[in-house]
Amino acid sequence: IATSAVRTAENKIEFLEKLSEQSGWIVKVITGEKEAELIFKGVLLAIEKFEQPSVILDIGGGSNELILGDKKEWLWKESQPTGMARVINRFSLSDPIHKGEVKMLQDYFTEAHKNAFTKCKEKEVKTLIGCSGAFDTIADIIDSINPGEKQRRTQVIKLDEFYKVYETLLKSTREERLTMKGMDFVRV
């Protein structure tokens, strides 16, 4: 299956034809809604059910999916074209990033995902479930291990641990991030 990057590519048809021609694969391009649904099903394989309303976040390159779930059901889902590859291409950011740029990005994501924030407030969500490589990288930095060294099904990241990594990343240059224990080079 193909997701956001192919969904919105100008050369989508040519790309899919070439891929099929060279590999023999028939690739189905799924909607953002279907992507969110599959993410939810994958999370349920890992945690079985939510003890309280929770929001799932998948940070992708082309899109971010947010799914509000409770028990074993999703209540609401969205897919927005706010993935990190798109953000990097859209905004010119300093190295290290400046405080004003952080605020600009916070405003951008808040506006793009305002419906998600509203739904989370309505359901009094207190738990974020991350299910992408970005969250694996945060966990690897916290655990001070090399990327892929630890295979995890789940891992709780405490808020203070997250903010410690967050502050470190904000203050660091690209070169410094490349040498951080746990940092996956594709996430620098």
Stretches found by the model and what they are:
Residues 3-53, 68-71, 76-188:
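Helical "lid/coupling" subdomains associated with nucleotide-phosphate turnover
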Residues 58:
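Conserved catalytic-loop position in the HRD/HxD motif
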Residues 62-68:
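Acidic, divalent-metal-coordinating active-site segment for phosphoryl/phosphodiester hydrolysis
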